[in-house]
Amino acid sequence: MNYFPWLTIIVVFPIFAGSLIFFLPHKGNRVIRWYTICICILELLLTTYAFCYHFQSDDPLIQLVEDYKWIDFFDFHWRLGIDGLSIGPILLTGFITTLATLAAWPVTRDSRLFHFLMLAMYSGQIGSFSSRDLLLFFIMWELELIPVYLLLAMWGGKKRLYSATKFILYTAGGSVFLLMGVLGVALYGSNEPTLNFETSVNQSYPVVLEIIFYIGFFIAFAVKSPIIPLHTWLPDTHGEAHYSTCMLLAGILLKMGAYGLIRINMELLPHAHSIFSPWLMIIGTIQIIYAASTSLGQRNLKKRIAYPSVSHMGFIIIGISSLTDTGLNGALLQIISHGFIGAALFFLAGTTYDRIRLVYLDEMGGIAIPMPKMFTMFSSFSMASLALPGMSGFVAELIVFFGIITGQKYLLIPKLLITFVMAIGIILTPIYSLSMPRQMFYGYKLFNAPKDSFFDSGPRELFLSISIFLPVIGIGIYPDFVLSLAVDKVEVILSNFFYR
């Protein structure tokens, strides 16, 4: 038991500090911006300090454990704890949220509410990644949805209300299945109902009941990830949201679905996961091809960027369903890798729109000359998205490939077939990834426009882009920095499939 409440402070601090925004003096938006950025930086430093000095990466057990009785009536506890699975997403959340607040600098309408919602979303996401109580996990999951809905509905494009409504209908529908799964697992406790995740992990369930629980949790996480055919909210949401909100969606929110698949479907329900893993492998393979094929038909730049998120999720699903430590480590690395790359591409798409006021690719062209810095950064992250060697995406996809090939669960012919189809998807990926910068920056359409109407990236955009690009290169060169966090926990999870 940890005696200093590090995780409670880390979870509560952003939303508590965010609520003070409404009491700041009315002296313009600058005070609110700087206050929010300082809160995010302080939170990131606090998280980094706590993990550096109080977390042992070679220990697969839950660390920084906190357990406080909250509601006596039905034995509801405030249980927090982290392990190798959650530390990476928590640090990613802190990093991307800090940069997203910097990206939101141009937002001036209702800036107090906007920045409060970003900080509230921050708390909900960290709470989801660190919860060790099933009901607390559900509460944090829902807490994070409310700010996202308001950010979508109040700041964005002309169809923002439609996209926000579609988002909340999909996610609320998924949350119903999540709540049913949580209550089902809780009520089927060994002797008495329990919401404790550790107790539930050690509990054995009848196969039929475990399959029912698995399907319920899977639907909830498939909506958030997203997994086809429950992905249709994603392009509309990304197409209408402000680009700082898109950074949070692509960088963190989608990763919560993948985290839930590993944390609950895989760790809590291993027998059902073993049964469903061949089907997940097929879904992941179809998803890679589907996203690569559909992306080419998107005229909207932000929708074109949204579909690679679906494709990358396909690799994560395949890694999770490979039932090998190599494949699962590759999936975890892909979660972190795409968090950086997706956030960067949406930021660059948004800043480009701020300058040229065009969002359809067939209306763009020839802006490489007046905006060379933007061209360089966008091209670099497009290369990272297509998994160029030396960048994080390449290592993640390569490890997932090795996970399939070395897996013992599947026969040789199915493994070769899945690998072949994945290879086709990888061949299609450069087509849609490189067609974006070609349509935007090459050609002639905007070449003769007045050069003073365009201005290139400023210090804020350069700082933000470089801040994301450095981890992408760093992980690509030395992936063990991320892999070492979860390697022991991955072995423990996979041991359930062979020794339980």
From Swiss-Prot:
Q: Which Pfam family, an example, fits this chain? A: Proton_antipo_M
Quote a single Gene Ontology cellular component term. Answer: chloroplast thylakoid membrane
Q: Specify whether Transport is a keyword of the entry.
A: no
An example GO BP is:
electron transport coupled proton transport
Q: Its Gene Ontology molecular function terms?
A: NADH dehydrogenase (ubiquinone) activity; ubiquinone binding
Keyword Translocase present in the record's keywords: the answer is: yes
Q: Which key words are in the record?
A: Chloroplast, Membrane, NAD, NADP, Plastid, Plastoquinone, Quinone, Thylakoid, Translocase, Transmembrane, Transmembrane helix
Main location as per UniProt: plastid
Entry EC number(s) = 7.1.1.-
Membrane topology, as annotated, equals: Multi-pass membrane protein
Residue ranges crossing the lipid bilayer per the database entry: 4-24, 35-55, 87-107, 134-154, 167-187, 208-228, 242-262, 272-292, 305-325, 330-350, 386-406, 411-431, 462-482
Quote the catalytic activity from the record.
a plastoquinone + NADH + (n+1) H(+)(in) = a plastoquinol + NAD(+) + n H(+)(out); a plastoquinone + NADPH + (n+1) H(+)(in) = a plastoquinol + NADP(+) + n H(+)(out)
Q: Cross-referenced InterPro entries, in alphabetical order?
A: NADH_Q_OxRdtase_chain4, NADH_Q_OxRdtase_chainM/4, NADH_UbQ_OxRdtase, ND/Mrp_TM
Q: Where in the cell is it found?
A: Plastid, Chloroplast thylakoid membrane
Give the main EC class.
translocase
| Family membership noted in the UniProt record | Belongs to the complex I subunit 4 family.
Q: NCBIfam families in the record, alphabetically? A: NDH_I_M
| Name of the featured protein | NAD(P)H-quinone oxidoreductase chain 4, chloroplastic
Source organism phylogeny:
Eukaryota, Viridiplantae, Streptophyta, Embryophyta, Tracheophyta
